[in-house]
Structures are given as structure tokens and as C-alpha cells.
A protein has these predicted regions:
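Residues within the helices of the helix-turn-helix
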Residues: 5
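Catalytic centers of hydrolytic enzymes
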Residues: 38-120, 124-130, 136, 249, ...
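N-terminal catalytic scaffold of extracellular/periplasmic and nuclease hydrolases
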Residues: 8-332, 337, 397-404, 417, ...
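Secretory targeting signals
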Residues: 1-2
Length: 565
């Protein structure tokens, strides 16, 4: 008789085969016009429970271009493991044909040519079509939002998240968890959450003063679907006050709190839960470690690190699902729950090809209503790009190279710094750069561009600190995101060295001189977590730079030399 783990491993193989026929092994297609919506949505119902997962939408209401990372390095046990495999290696692992839709959706190479053929991705009106299609087959499917939803665009900033709240309410989620939402400030978050028609979950959101669970955010919610009791436990981003300004939400503390997670799993099991789902914003590697430490979790729906995987990853008896970002994918998971336990599943990562999937008319109209008061500002053309502008990658992206150049020129600095965030769409060569495009990569509630003086020693400390957040071998010390971007300076990094000795050969580009630890340099940056930061907003800095230059031509930077890979 098969053990449950053996059964899940067999089920994993079935998921792989299903993913290959439904996603990864489409015939090579010259252009997206040869795809059709039925191919994207095709799914043979399985079991008695369906989950729908979206995460890290970052307020992208409309279709976009989005290039996946070229470099996404893993360290320690994550070395050479997904999601730390990219490009052709990723395609070989999953049996994805070169030139296929899956190639375009999941990997970075040949992006410009393939974007011309396959077009834009995402758009919440298209996401709505996918959700409605699944619900037509499974009316009681659970829709779960992994957070980073009310942040990341011009309209989201100016409405304090209300545009996204309105549109997501129309999609009718059953639960969500949180990260960037808290940068709206705790008062605004409370105002929204108190009026949500669905569960706002976070087992690790605590009252900072009393170190007790925060009343506004229940740890879990119980559902009955397909004749089975299901517990959904929320896991908000653990490192909120470190990665984001703690002064914006001083009432709350976070942390991984895996001991409390175990207590919650045990509690819901005692209440009769036959399926335990964790809706997580930990990041994929943190979720893998948590799955190995907390027993009794059946499914982790992973968010934060923006990974998109066409197959689940099995850790012990827990499957982990990664559903990408920016509205580019929707995951469907069908589960067979029998006699109080999960016996198997089928999974499909559905890419949202915007020219193939028809928009839901009601949601499309609702999106247009949110944008209408701002449409003139959104559509104003600031310049044109001759280059591919993208963000994702451990060390640099051309969007951030552009932002760093703007900071140096507009703020008259020696060195510039841009945060290694992973959100923000891409721009293809020949595309106009609108104000909306600029805000899509800069919009945040603490975006002032500071100009200050740092010693060479302090710059080194900053780089070492961020590098440890990214390349610490223990996932519980990783905060997600990528390396801080640097303009005006080059350096070498050995990702396998210990903290304090990873960063060497720091050089000021305009003189070719080594950075002097005792010398002071003028540094401009943005997204400081410090309260009362002064300076112009970063989107104004970038807009002024692009408007003045008109045509943007920028090649990927090679100013970071990477060792240890």
C-alpha cells in the first residue's frame, strides 16, 4: 500500500505530465495568434477541492510586458534548486521547448523577439476571465490572494489602494495576506480591512506592545468546500519593520513565528480541518524551510519572491505552489481530500496572455472607472526607449540602471543607490515611456530621493548588509528582493563568503579610483526607511531625466563582478 508521501510523489508526476500537456509542451508557435483561450484554460477536473492562487499583483490593472530574471542565484541548500534556475537551464529542467509560449512566459532569453510575437501579459480583466472559467467548473473554488496587491502604480498611490480594493472585491477572493499593503500606514490598512468582504489573515501579525495576536488579522479561517473542511492560515511578510519603514505601522510586529504556525496547524486540525493551506508571503526559500519544520501543512501558496514554477515543489508531505507576479499567472490546484487527508492533486500554472484571453467586460469597465480620473496624467508620453528596460535580476536591471543615472545627474551625486525590489513591468525597444510606466517602477509611499554624504566604509557596510539579506545560507535570514542597485561605482561580490567579506574592489567610476573607506562621497538614493527623509519624489527625478534626454538607450551594466557561482 502506498504511503501518503509515496502517493504525493506519484501525484507530483501526474502534475508534471499534466503541466507538460497543458502548459510546458505546447507545439512551437510562431506567434500568439495561434494560441487560443481554451488551450490556456484546459484542465481536467480532479478530486473535490479547487484552489485558485494569485499573488504579488503590485497594482497592475492593465496588461504589461514582464521579463523574468536572468540571474537568480541560490546559496546553501538552495544552490542549483528551483527557483534558482533560469533561462535555458530552467527550460531543460521542465521540458519546455525553445520558442514556445512557456519559454516566453517563464524565462528571460530572446525576450524582445518573443514579446513581439506573444504580446503583453496580465490585466486583471483577463485574470477575472480565468477565475470565472474555473468557477464555472468548480463553483466553490477558493480564491486566495497572497498579498502585495494594494501597492505599485500611479492610481494605487493616489487612491491609497482603493482602486485595487475595488477591483479585487469584484473578483471575490476568500482570503488574503499582506506585505506592501502596510506601507499605506496602519490607519489606512485598518480602514480598508475593517470593510473587506473576505478574510484578512496573518498568524504572524502581532500587537507590538503586548506581543499578542492582532485582533484585526485572524490567524486562519475555516471553509467547507467539496464536502471537506479546509483551514486557510495566513502568513504575512515576516520582516516588515526591517525591509519597510516600521514607523508606518508601529502597532504591529511580525516575524516567521513557525512555533505559532505549528500551534495554528494543530488547532485547526483539532477543529476538524481535513486540508490545511498556508497562504504565505514568506518567499519561496523561507516557505521551503518552514515546510520542513512545521508538520501538518498540506499546501503552501507561496508569495513575495515572485517565482513562477510550472510544477509544485514537494517538501516532506507539503506541496509548495509559486504563482509569479504582476498578474502574469494564475495557479489552479485541484485536490482529492478523502477520509480527513489530502490524497493527491493536479496543478496548472496558467499564463495570462493578454491577446489570447478575452477580458471580462464588467471587470474591464470597473478598471476603466478607477483610471478615468487620472487618464491624462497616466498616458502622457515622457520619452521613448530604444532599449529593453527591465528590473528582475540579482544584481542589476536596466530600469534600475536608468534610475541610478537619473539620481546621479538630477541630484548631482557621485554614487547612487536604488532598492533591489522585484516589482515593476518591462518596456520593450521602440515603446513610448509614459508617466504611468515611470510610476509602475517607482510608486511607493516613501519614495523621496535623498542626497547625502556617506563614507566609503559606510557604503561598504550597506552593500554587505544587503548581500547578507540575499545570500545568507539560512533562508530564515533572507528577506527576499535583490541586491541594492549602484550607480557611479563598481564592485566585486563573492556570494559564498561570510558577511563582512563578500564585497571587494569598490571603485568610483568617474575617476577609476578605489573607494577610500575614510573618504566622504555624495550619494543619492530613494526608498529610505528613515522617517523625515527629505528630497524630491523619485518619480519626478526620473521623469525630469527622461524628459530632458527624450530617447533612452541603455545597455545592461557590467559593473558588478560576481564570484562564487
Amino acid at each position: 500500500m502506498l504511503s501518503r508521501r509515496d502517493f504525493l510523489q506519484v501525484s507530483m508526476a501526474a502534475s508534471s505530465l499534466y503541466g507538460a500537456s497543458g502548459f510546458g509542451n505546447w507545439a512551437k508557435l510562431a506567434a500568439q495568434q495561434k494560441l487560443n483561450q481554451n488551450q490556456l484554460l484546459e484542465f481536467e477536473n480532479f478530486g473535490n477541492v479547487s484552489l485558485i492562487h494569485v499573488t504579488d499583483i503590485h497594482a497592475q490593472l492593465k496588461p504589461i510586458y514582464f521579463r523574468e530574471p536572468e540571474v537568480n542565484l541560490g546559496v546553501g541548500d538552495a544552490l542549483g534548486q528551483v527557483p534558482h534556475i533560469t533561462g535555458s537551464d530552467f527550460r531543460r529542467l521542465y521540458g519546455i521547448d525553445d520558442g514556445s509560449p512557456a519559454h516566453y512566459a517563464l524565462t528571460h532569453d530572446d525576450f524582445i523577439a518573443m514579446a513581439d510575437g506573444y504580446g503583453r501579459v496580465g490585466g486583471l480583466d483577463r485574470v477575472a476571465t480565468v477565475i470565472n472559467s474555473i468557477r464555472a467548473e468548480r463553483p466553490d473554488a477558493l480564491l486566495l490572494d497572497g498579498g502585495d496587491t494594494w501597492h505599485g502604480s500611479y492610481t494605487c498611490y493616489h487612491t491609497q489602494g482603493q482602486d485595487m480594493v475595488n477591483v479585487m472585491n469584484a473578483l471575490k477572493p476568500d482570503a488574503m495576506t499582506f506585505h506592501w499593503e502596510f506601507t499605506l500606514g496602519s490607519d489606512r490598512v485598518s480602514e480598508i480591512v475593517e470593510n473587506l468582504p473576505f478574510a484578512a489573515l496573518g498568524q504572524n501579525i502581532f500587537d507590538a506592545e503586548w506581543d499578542e495576536p492582532a485582533e484585526l488579522f485572524p490567524p486562519y479561517k475555516m471553509f467547507e468546500r467539496g464536502g471537506s473542511k479546509i483551514a486557510v492560515i495566513g502568513q504575512a511578510f515576516p520582516y516588515m519593520p526591517i525591509a519597510n519603514p516600521g514607523w508606518m505601522f508601529p502597532e504591529y510586529s511580525f516575524g516567521i513565528r513557525d512555533s505559532n504556525m505549528q500551534d495554528m496547524v494543530d488547532e485547526v486540525r483539532s477543529l476538524g480541518a481535513e486540508l490545511v493551506v498556508v497562504l504565505s508571503h514568506n518567499g519561496f526559500d523561507v516557505d521551503k524551510k518552514m515546510a520542513g519544520r512545521v508538520s501538518g501543512i498540506d499546501v503552501i501558496l507561496s508569495g513575495h519572491t515572485h517565482d513562477a514554477l510550472p510544477e509544485p515543489v514537494l517538501i516532506g508531505k507539503t506541496i509548495i505552489i509559486a504563482s509569479g507576479s504582476n498578474g502574469k499567472f494564475v495557479s489552479r490546484v485541484d485536490l482529492d481530500v478523502q477520509n480527513g487527508r489530502m490524497m493527491g492533486y493536479k496543478h496548472k500554472l496558467i499564463p495570462i496572455f493578454s491577446d489570447v484571453i478575452s477580458p471580462d467586460k464588467a471587470v474591464a469597465n470597473l478598471i476603466d472607472q478607477q483610471r478615468a480620473p487620472y487618464i491624462k496624467e497616466l498616458n502622457e508620453v515622457i520619452g521613448k526607449s530604444e532599449s529593453l528596460l527591465y528590473r528582475r535580476g540579482n544584481f542589476n536591471g536596466t530600469w534600475d540602471d536608468l534610475i541610478c543615472e537619473a539620481l546621479i545627474e538630477e541630484r548631482e551625486a557621485d554614487i547612487s543607490m536604488s532598492p533591489g525590489v522585484r516589482w515593476g513591468p518591462s518596456i520593450v525597444p521602440g515603446q513610448d515611456i509614459t508617466r504611468e510606466d515611470i510610476w509602475n517602477v517607482t510608486a511607493m509611499t516613501y519614495g523621496k530621493a535623498y542626497r547625502t554624504e556617506f563614507t566609503g566604509e559606510f557604503i561598504h557596510i550597506i552593500l554587505e548588509d544587503v548581500a547578507d539579506n540575499l545570500f545568507n545560507a539560512d533562508p530564515y535570514y533572507q528577506q527576499g528582493g535583490d541586491m541594492v542597485r549602484i550607480g557611479g561605482m563598481s564592485y566585486k561580490i563573492d556570494i559564498n563568503k561570510p558577511q563582512g567579506s563578500r564585497i571587494t574592489d569598490m571603485t568610483l567610476l568617474k575617476t577609476g579610483e578605489k573607494i577610500d573607506p575614510s573618504k566622504t562621497y555624495i550619494v543619492s538614493g530613494w526608498a529610505s526607511v528613515n522617517e523625515n527623509t527629505e528630497g524630491p519624489q523619485i518619480w519626478d527625478v526620473v521623469e525630469n531625466y527622461i524628459r530632458r534626454n527624450e530617447i533612452i538607450s541603455i545597455e545592461p551594466s557590467n559593473n558588478v563582478k560576481v564570484a562564487g557561482i
